[in-house]
Amino acid sequence: MKIVKLITIFAMIATLMVTVTNGEAVFLTPDQIKAMIKRHG
């Protein structure tokens, strides 16, 4: 298992959690997820 894959899965789960919390649909492209990882990583 690659760390990048784990981070990507975690980012997707976190995005889903945020979507549920906000009560509105938030869709991120893989590029946006990568940008988020770069900012926070």
Swiss-Prot record:
Expressed by the venom gland. Residues 1-25 form the signal peptide. It comes from the Eukaryota. It is found in: Secreted. Keywords: Amidation, Secreted, Signal. The keyword Signal applies. The modification Histidine amide is found at H40. GO terms for cellular component: extracellular region. Venom protein with unknown function. Does not induce paralysis when a high dose is administered by intrathoracic injection into the blowfly Lucilia caesar. This is U15-myrmicitoxin-Tb1b. It comes from Tetramorium bicarinatum.
